[in-house]
């Protein structure tokens, strides 16, 4: 529905985070490379910071028209919210994308898992086969920024099986869908300089549309049947949090891969921590 940049934006939002500079916390700065079938098509810059009880995020992504699949496009996302126990409770979410002359905008306010205020441009087009959005589809949900922030019982990888054992209820302004995660494996990745080096938890994912979608669309049916979806999670230094290190989405043109080439966590008033951050 949103074009190539929308697909990329929906994926790069899986890297999260930040709070006010005055708060004591951990800052995570990351660069994600975006490729399709092994060809680099873009990048995303993420600056994030976490405390025990809060997060916010600023994410800037860009794709380049290196092939017929992608045009020059940009995406800007931001979000913030609270961390309570093992729950992520977003309070605001903003999205802006531009691909040629086509633009999208989302402004969303939330409280305790419920959308309290929403502005979306463009609005969903009217089609007889579109599953309508009802008021209940805006309740007990998270936005795409908060969707893949996983709270663990202690800093580090922890119990990988437990981390992946979840269904994430997402509302993005246009659609309500579930992302069902399942544990695949725990593995070690190696990085040099300021790249991540350490263990990651690999979760498989399935897309389950709930409302706002059209099952008559080939793209919707493809994503429902797509079994080549993965998220690799890495721990944030000294925090009970996992964030995506690598995202894989199988497409008809080859795998869309978003991977962190830079992953630097810094405690407030401390030197940057690179490499193994468990």
Stretches found by the model and what they are:
Residues 101-145:
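Internal, conserved structured core segments that host functional sites
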Residues 135-174:
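Extracytoplasmic beta-rich ectodomain segments of secreted or membrane-anchored proteins
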Residues 15, 23, 120, 130-134, ...:
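A general, composition-driven signal for non-globular sequence regions
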Residues 4-17:
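Bacterial N-terminal signal peptides
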Residues 22-112, 158-278:
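Acidic, serine/threonine-rich low-complexity disordered tracts
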